[in-house]
């Protein structure tokens, strides 16, 4: 009996999660093994943008 309530609550979030999931899957594919560098790259880019 709980299933309809759960699916109603989760469904809108699921649509967002699917989009996020696709985006993060692409990101993981592009930067596999490079994830530690992402933060540094962002930091360097924001430093460049400030100058």
From Swiss-Prot:
Changing residue 42 to A: Almost complete loss of Astexin-1 production. Is unfolded. Irreversibly unfolds upon heat treatment. Between 50 and 65 degrees Celsius, the protein shows an intermediate fold. At more than 65 degrees Celsius, the protein is completely unfolded. Residues 1-28 form a propeptide. This lasso peptide is probably hydrolyzed to a linear form by the isopeptidase AtxE1, in vivo. Keywords: Antibiotic, Antimicrobial, Isopeptide bond. The record marks 42-43 as: Important for stabilization of the lasso structure. One of its GO terms (biological process) is defense response to bacterium. There is a cross-link at residues 29-37 (Isoaspartyl glycine isopeptide (Gly-Asp)). Shows weak antimicrobial activity against its phylogenetic relative Caulobacter crescentus. Does not show activity against other bacteria tested (E.coli, Vibrio sp, Burkhoderia thailandensis, and Salmonella newport). Is composed of a ring composed by 9 residues, a loop and a C-terminal tail. The peptide is threaded when the C-terminal tail is inserted throught the isopeptide-bonded ring. This is Astexin-1. It comes from Asticcacaulis excentricus (strain ATCC 15261 / DSM 4724 / KCTC 12464 / NCIMB 9791 / VKM B-1370 / CB 48). The lineage of its organism: Bacteria, Pseudomonadati, Pseudomonadota, Alphaproteobacteria, Caulobacterales.
């Amino acid at each position: 009996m709980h299933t309809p309530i759960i699916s109603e609550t989760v469904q809108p979030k699921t649509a967002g999660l699917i989009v996020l999931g696709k985006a993060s899957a692409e990101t993981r594919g592009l930067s596999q093994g490079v994830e530690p560098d992402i933060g540094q790259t962002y930091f360097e880019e924001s430093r460049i943008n400030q100058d």
